[in-house]
């Protein structure tokens, strides 16, 4: 079996909660908006972030990686003071959920981010006050720089993005979808030279991420631990479920992420 150019080892961030182990276990059908996804189990993806403006409009996802840091996509253009990190959300139509709404003190975008090529599409958000871990809020593990993943491994992406490439219908409940990973070479067969070594591709098998999922997680399970291997970045405008979606390859940025956290 081919290997994606990336050994799955973990960078532990956080407190005694550790990382990547939800208190509430996810339930996956692996059968098939996200597009062609399904409702997640309440609280089963505790690192999922909703990025919102002051009106409560959800515009991007993100992943909690420690009590003070969230990782998202650079193209989400998060502005401290104008945008907020919302933790613990599941049903966006509910006003009764135990949410944590946190201000952003700093948004640190990778210095080589290119909005034309979408290369290096990653931003770190420092929270103005630390998140409080609960059964519904805890961090994900980061893939390390020497990550290796087998082709065809099924991973999961989550979010509240559009349910279809047509129209603007978004779900109330957090969606999840299992997606197979594809190699860089396979992805380049569809996207050509747009795919760089700093990207990872998944999907093309009847399901996809879509607009509004941007910045959110692509996670794979190792044993009982979930590891963040991708950040939702880009794909077809109509969210074609037969085309692989493109994610920022977290392993290429784990050293930079840890350096930013250490010095800020």
UniProtKB/Swiss-Prot annotation:
Signal sequence segment? 1-18
Q: Which CDD domains does its entry note?
A: Tryp_SPc (cd00190)
Q: Which GO terms describe its biological process?
A: protein catabolic process; proteolysis
Keyword NADP: yes or no?
no
Q: Which UniProt keywords apply?
A: Disulfide bond, Glycoprotein, Hydrolase, Protease, Serine protease, Signal, Zymogen
Keyword Glycoprotein in record: yes
Name the EC number(s). Answer: 3.4.21.-
Q: Where is the active site?
A: 75 (charge relay system), 121 (charge relay system), 214 (charge relay system)
Spell out the Pfam families in the cross-references: Trypsin (PF00089)
GO MF terms here are: serine-type endopeptidase activity; serine-type peptidase activity
Q: What class of enzyme is it?
A: hydrolase
Pro-peptide positions on chain: 19-33
Q: List all annotated glycosylation positions.
A: 114
Q: Which family does it belong to?
A: Belongs to the peptidase S1 family.
Q: What is this protein called?
A: Chymotrypsin-like protease CTRL-1
Q: Which organism is it from?
A: Homo sapiens
- The encoding gene is CTRL
């Amino acid at each position: 079996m081919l290997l994606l150019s990336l050994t799955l080892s973990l960078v532990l961030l956080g407190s005694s909660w550790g990382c990547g182990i939800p208190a509430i276990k996810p339930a996956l059908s692996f059968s098939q908006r996200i597009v062609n996804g399904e409702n997640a189990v309440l609280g089963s993806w505790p690192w999922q972030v909703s990025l919102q403006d002051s009106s409560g409009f959800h515009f991007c996802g993100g992943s909690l990686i420690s009590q003070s840091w969230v990782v998202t996509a650079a193209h989400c253009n998060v502005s401290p003071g104008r945008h907020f990190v919302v933790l613990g959300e599941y049903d966006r139509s509910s006003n009764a959920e135990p949410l944590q709404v946190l201000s952003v003190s700093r948004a640190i975008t990778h210095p080589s981010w290119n909005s034309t090529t979408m290369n290096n599409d990653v931003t770190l958000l420092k929270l103005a006050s630390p998140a409080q871990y609960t059964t519904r809020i805890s961090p994900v593990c980061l893939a390390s720089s020497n990550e290796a993943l087998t082709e065809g491994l099924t991973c999961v992406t989550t979010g509240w993005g559009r349910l279809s490439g047509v129209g603007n219908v978004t779900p109330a409940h957090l969606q999840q979808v299992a997606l197979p990973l594809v190699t860089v070479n396979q992805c380049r067969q569809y996207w050509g030279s747009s795919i760089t070594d700093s990207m990872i591709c998944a999907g093309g098998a009847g399901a996809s991420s879509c607009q509004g999922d941007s910045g959110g997680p692509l996670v794979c399970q190792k044993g009982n631990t979930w590891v963040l291997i991708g950040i939702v970045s880009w794909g077809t405008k109509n969210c074609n479920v037969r085309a692989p979606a493109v994610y920022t390859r977290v392993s290429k940025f784990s050293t930079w992420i840890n350096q930013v956290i250490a010095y800020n």
